[in-house]
Structure formats: C-alpha cells, structure tokens
C-alpha cells in the first residue's frame, strides 16, 4: 500500500511539472483500456476527425518516399490558414485533425491555440516524406530518432496534442512484415523519451492499411508485449464502405469482430471511400452507433483539401475555400450522430493494463520478430567512430556509399552493421549513421588485411585517420557493446560470423549452402554474405532490389 501511495504521489508531482498549455479548453486525452477518455471528467472521447494537410502524396499510404527534394506543407505553421479553416471544422463538429508532416523547426503555437479554442485536438505523424522507416530496407537509426524526438519536443507542450503516429502503412502486405519491429522500436523509444523528459503522458501509436493477410496480426503485434513496448493505440486506414451499404455487407461487422478483443484503442485513421462520388458518408451513422463504439473510437475522414486523388471536402482557389458536395454530405451525417459514451469509472483496474500475446511469426503471412532493434545511441556511435584508423573519405557523396558497401562487404562479414526484422538479429552498430557504418566496415577490412596501405584506399574513397583514438570499449544503451579500434572479423553478440540465420527471410538457401562461394574482387564470398550485402546495398538505391545471381 505504501509503495502504491508513493507511486501516486510521484505521478501527481510529475503531472504538475508537466502541465500543458490550453488545458482549460482541451484537457489532455488519456488511454484507459481500449478507449480514449477526457482526463478532466472521464467521459469517452470518440474521434470526429479530418485529415488536414495539402499535397500529402509523399507521406500518406506510401510508407517511405525516397525523393530527397520533396517538400511538404506544415499546416500547423500557417496561422492564416488555420484561422481561415477553423470554422469549417467547427461546422462539422470536428474534434481531431490528423497532420502527416510537422516541421519541428517552426512555431505551431498560434494554430494550436486556434484549434484548442475550438475544442480540436491534433494527432501528428512523427515522420515526414523522406525521413521515415523504409518498408523495403527498414532501419531504426539515429536520423529517425532525432527527427521523431524533435517533433515531440516541439509539440509536447500543447494539451490538444492527442497523440503521435510512429508510422503509417510501413508494413502493407505479407512481403514486408519484417519492417514492423523497427516501427515498434520507434514506439517504444518515443514513449520512453516522453517519460524520461518528464513530459505529460502523450500516447504513441501506429496507423496501418487494411490488408487482408496482415490486418489482424499487425494490430495484435503492436498491441502485444509489455506496457513499455506496446503501442498506446492503433489506427487502420479503412476504405471498405463505399456508397450505400450496411454494417453487415460493408465489411464493418467483420472488422469489428476481428478487433473486439484488442486491448488498446482502435479507430479509423483514414476513411471515406470515393468509388461512388459524391461521397454520401452513410457509414458515419454506423461508425458512431452502439454496433461499433464499444470496439472503435471513431475515425478521421480523408481529407480536407481537394487534390488530384479527389478525396477533398473543400477546394482551395488561392486563399478562397469552397465547400464541395462531400463536405455538405459529411456535415449532415456527422451532425446527426448521437453516440452512447462510456465512463472511465466503469473500467476495471485489470482491464486498464491488460495486454495480449504476440502473434505467431512462423506463418507465411506474418514473419515479424518480437525482438526489437536497439535504441539508437549517438554517444555510442561517436565513441566507436573516433577509434577508426580507416574511414570513408569526406569527399565521397552519400549516394556512392552503396558501391563501397557492396565491395567491402564482399570481403568481410558485415553483420555488425545490418539488421533483420524477421530473425530479430540486429548488429550492434546497425543504428549508427550511414557514414559511420561505412567507416566501421572499412576499418574492419583494413585491420583484417594487417593494415596494408592499399587496404585503406578503395580508389581514394577511404583514407587513414591520423586522429584515431586508442582502442577502448564502448557500450550502448541496453548493454550492447562493441570493441573499438582493431578487432577480428568475428561478429559479436546475437550476430554469428556466418549470419546463417539471416538467410531465411530473403532466400531459400539456408545454412546447408552457406559454404557456396562466389569470387568477388579476388575474394571468396559466401551466399549468406551475399544476402547481407543485398540487404545493405538496397538501402541506398531507393528500393531497387539488387540480386547477384
């Protein structure tokens, strides 16, 4: 009992320290069991949302955008637009906006205040079009960690931040379920970051597509495990109800049955099929009816602005907004709902912390490991990199790294810099920057060749580091460590020198064929090493799969 009282007092103190702006107008939303509640009165919160961002083609439903020049419009940094649009949200009883890309270097206070005064919350994606987990070659690395934490730092002070998405449709079919451990690691680390910085508790979740093969397994995957690791909520981009339909024939009944036992809130993170135009939004009445509200927490209509995809509720000509038929139909539908709302006081204590078993990853449709990638650790990467005697030359362009990775990994085992979401094997240096990872393997090769002068050249792409520090031991968060300086080619920890278990996810050649070799630059390279190289190289060529057979 004493420990419980101490915990409650600690939470009370932290709550006081982490008081957010605009709480009187928009009290923080909290997660209890499988529902959202207003923190001030314990009434259930159902999302009545609209997706709010122009030109989101690079951040919506693509999972990853390799175009480094793509720009995105941050709608929460444009106060004039927020003032212009807020009345259209008020008129549709909107209480949630989904924003797909936040610029963490911009100020968002004026827009957040405008929306708070209107009782509107924001749920924001932590990624942006070119900085997100790539479903083809997934990583959870320092660049992503820095991007995600900067968004949290920028937005955490506003009480009307409902939550953050750590990913959107990253895994979108059975062929890329290995990407999910990297997104779940992002969920885990962002929850810990929020807690470690004494920010108020802000939910972190995931937004998925509605893929028939993976829809149930991926929801269970993000909801399973410890409270520290699991997602706080789960969104599904749902486009099954088109035109006029019913709860039973649309697929909504089946989906409600699929997720009735999910232990975290689930909602439509996008909805509004446009196969029939204009959209009549008949599904709105069902979504907020007793048939669904015990399982579902509402939804977010896709989308506010009319774009080439014709999902818009309004059109924009210069700064002039014109409502479309979709807007008027949605307005009529959403203003007609009268949902029954649950009360937090009725939730049993054991239900509020209930978790679930993780899905079996031995099936062909779900292969994601429950072992998650390590937390990116900048100090660890810096510690190791300072000891490299051979490094990539500063004048080598990042787009040329793939060629060097392919060459050097033909000579040595690159397990320490690679990661496999199917087997749950993550090299101890896999989360560091591309430049540091390349220098790591160049340095390893240099020492394996007994520091021959020509072993640190690679046609001028590598050079001797005269300022290398003395060999020392570096440890990463969670106890992972690597020996800096000179080291053998045998990998450490969970990564065996043969990397034999890594082949199961990308090739039918197993350990029995690991001795088969291919000559590369005068060296013998095993088939298993070849698979590792393929995984590394494809990360630098925008999704092009390179097969060396």
Swiss-Prot record:
Disulfide bridge positions per record: 82-111, 224-358, 242-273, 381-432, 390-456, 409-414
Cell location: Cell membrane
Cited InterPro entries: Glucanosyltransferase, Glycoside_hydrolase_SF, X8
Comp. bias intervals (Low complexity): 484-514
Molecular-function GO terms, alphabetical: 1,3-beta-glucanosyltransferase activity
The entry's keywords: Cell membrane, Disulfide bond, Glycoprotein, GPI-anchor, Lipoprotein, Membrane, Signal
One Pfam family from the record: Glyco_hydro_72
Principal location listed in the UniProt entry: membrane
Glycosylated residues in this chain: 41, 173, 261, 467
GO biological process terms on file: fungal-type cell wall (1->3)-beta-D-glucan biosynthetic process; fungal-type cell wall organization
Topology of the protein relative to the lipid bilayer: Lipid-anchor; GPI-anchor
PANTHER family found in the cross-reference section: 1,3-BETA-GLUCANOSYLTRANSFERASE GAS1
Protein name: Protein EPD2
């Amino acid at each position: 009992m004493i420990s419980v009282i101490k915990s409650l007092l600690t939470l009370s103190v932290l709550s006081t320290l982490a008081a957010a702006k605009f709480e009187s107008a928009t009290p923080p939303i909290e997660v209890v069991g499988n529902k959202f509640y207003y923190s001030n009165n314990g009434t259930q919160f159902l999302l009545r949302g609209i997706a709010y961002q122009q030109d989101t083609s690079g951040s919506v439903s693509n999972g990853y955008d390799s175009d480094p020049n793509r720009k995105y419009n941050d709608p929460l940094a444009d106060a004039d637009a927020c003032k212009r649009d807020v009345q259209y949200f008020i008129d549709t009883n909107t209480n949630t906006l989904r924003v797909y890309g936040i610029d963490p270097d911009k100020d968002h206070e004026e827009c957040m205040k405008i929306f708070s005064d209107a009782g509107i919350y924001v749920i924001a994606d932590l990624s942006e079009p070119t900085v997100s987990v790539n479903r083809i070659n997934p990583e959870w690395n320092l660049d992503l960690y820095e991007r995600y934490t900067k968004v949290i730092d920028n937005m955490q002070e506003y009480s009307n931040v409902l939550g953050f998405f750590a990913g959107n449709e990253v895994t979108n079919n059975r062929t890329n379920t290995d990407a999910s451990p990297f997104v779940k690691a992002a969920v885990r680390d962002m929850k810990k970051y929020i807690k470690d910085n004494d920010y108020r508790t802000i939910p972190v979740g995931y937004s998925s597509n509605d893929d028939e093969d993976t829809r149930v397994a991926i929801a269970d995957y993000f909801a399973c495990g410890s409270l520290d690791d699991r997602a706080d909520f789960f969104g599904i981009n749902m486009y099954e109800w088109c035109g006029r339909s019913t709860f039973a024939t649309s697929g909504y009944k089946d989906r409600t049955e699929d997720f009735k036992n999910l232990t975290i809130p689930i909602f439509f993170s996008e909805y509004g099929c446009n196969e029939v135009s204009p959209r009549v939004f008949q599904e709105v009445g069902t979504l907020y009816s007793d048939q669904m509200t015990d399982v579902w927490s509402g939804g977010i209509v896709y989308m506010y602005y009319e774009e080439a995809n014709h999902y818009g509720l309004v059109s924009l000509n210069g700064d002039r907004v014109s409502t479309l038929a979709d807007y008027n139909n949605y307005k009529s539908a959403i203003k007609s709902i009268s949902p029954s709302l649950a009360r937090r006081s009725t939730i049993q204590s054991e239900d509020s912390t209930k978790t679930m078993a993780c899905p079996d990853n031995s099936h062909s449709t779900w292969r994601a490991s429950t072992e998650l990638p390590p937390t990116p650790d900048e100090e660890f990467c810096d510690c190791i990199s300072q000891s490299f005697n051979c490094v990539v030359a500063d004048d080598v362009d990042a787009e040329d790294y793939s060629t060097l990775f392919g060459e050097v990994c033909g000579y040595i085992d690159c397990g320490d810099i690679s990661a496999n979401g199917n087997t749950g094997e993550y090299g101890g240096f896999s989360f560091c920057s591309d430049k540091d990872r390349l220098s790591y393997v160049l340095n390893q090769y240099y020492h394996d060749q007994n520091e021959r002068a020509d072993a640190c050249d690679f046609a001028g792409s590598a050079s001797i580091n005269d300022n290398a520090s003395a060999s020392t031991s570096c440890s990463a968060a969670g106890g992972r460590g690597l020996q800096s300086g000179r080291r053998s080619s045998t990998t450490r920890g969970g990564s065996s020198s043969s990397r034999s278990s890594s082949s199961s996810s990308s090739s039918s050649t197993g350990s029995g064929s690991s001795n088969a070799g291919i000559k590369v630059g005068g060296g013998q390279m095993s088939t298993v090493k070849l698979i590792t190289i393929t995984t590394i190289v494809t990360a630098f060529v925008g999704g092009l799969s390179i097969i060396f057979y």
